[in-house]
Structures are given as C-alpha cells and as structure tokens.
C-alpha cells in the first residue's frame, strides 16, 4: 500500500470536478483525527476490492478506532467533502477513473467480535468468516450459509448478503450505526427493509454502520469449524 508522499502527490493539487476540495489544512485535519499512516492519497482502489480492479481514490482513510471514525466523518460532513464508505471491498466495482473525494474503509481496525450467550456482536469491519469462526468456537451455529462470503459485517448488512439459501437477515437482530448527523442509532432487523440484496442503508449512503448483533443457536460448533 502507498503512504503519503509529498514528493509524488502535492496536497494542494488534488482536484475534484474542477474544484479544489482539498488543501493542506483539510488533509492535515484528516491525518490528525484518523492518524497520518491511515490517510493515503491517490490510493488505487484495486488494492481494496476483491475484483482487483479500480482507479484511485483521491483520499483513502482507514480509521482504526471508532473515535477516529467518528472524527473522520465529522470532518467530511463539516467540510462538505464527497464521501464514500466501504468495507472489505467484496463485490465492489470501481471504474478506472476511481472515486472522487474521501473513501473511508472500515475493515482495518474496526473488527472486534463479542460473544454473549447466543448473541454475537461484531464491528462493521469484521469478516463474516471470522464471526462464524468465533461463533463456532462458542458452540453456536447459524452463520454457516454466509460464512464463506468474502465480505465484512457492515457490507453484509448493507446489501443483506446471502448464499446457499441463507441471508444476513435470517440471523440479524439489530444494527448500530451513525446517521448523517452523527447521531448514534440502533435499529432492529425488522426496521431495516431487508430484501434480496438490499436494505435501508442503500437508501441512506451517508449512514455508517458500526456494528451488528446476530442471534444464533446452540449446536455442534466443531462441525462448522
């Protein structure tokens, strides 16, 4: 992955749709809240999609804490920066021209998984395979149909991912997210308008999924592993 290099990319020269959205102050602000090593310029999206295609994102940010994520989103909203939120890049198609504005990826550090009885809560960046493995180790089953999907929890909620006759909505209890005012909200699965590869989040692309809780059942986890 590329790092910020002023010799290769002049901070004040990034242009979006003929306008200078970015200047040194804005980029320094993003680096200040997300961490300098977590802010990359002209980052090829092919490095972050399972299809391995896609041109550069003007600015690519990977917050590694929830606090850093909130501060990054706040900076983008306050400065009216074009914003795209992505997860693990599974089934994400990006054109050769890339993505204008700021791309925030949730997969780097936002991947905690907690098991409490038959409930499993996973951060948006956690991989479905890791959630299924954690559940199986706790003797829980129910994630098997979607465990092989190479995507994140956030992406699975966003599009109601499914495979082998099962879908995310089959096990989902609730989703915690930030709306476009950065208000922390929790919605039960029944209020997420989840259908075939769709959910309420597709209608609200500025909402940022933080975590999801699934309800599983006791079983022979060893058979899943």
What is each residue range found by the language model?
Residues 1-86:
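N-terminal, positively charged, Ser/Thr/Ala/Gly-biased leader segments
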Residues 2, 6, 40-41, 47-50, ...:
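Phosphate/pyrophosphate- and phosphate-bearing ligand-binding catalytic cores of soluble enzymes
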Residues 26, 71-72, 131, 197, ...:
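Hydrophobic side chains in well-ordered alpha-helices
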Residues 45-83, 95-140, 167-186:
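N-terminal glycine-rich flavin-associated loop
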Residues 136, 147, 156-159, 164-165, ...:
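Core subunits and conserved enzymes of cellular information-processing
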Residues 141-145:
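Immediate flanking context of iron-sulfur cluster ligation sites
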Residues 151:
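An amphipathic, basic-hydrophobic helix/alpha-beta surface used to engage anionic
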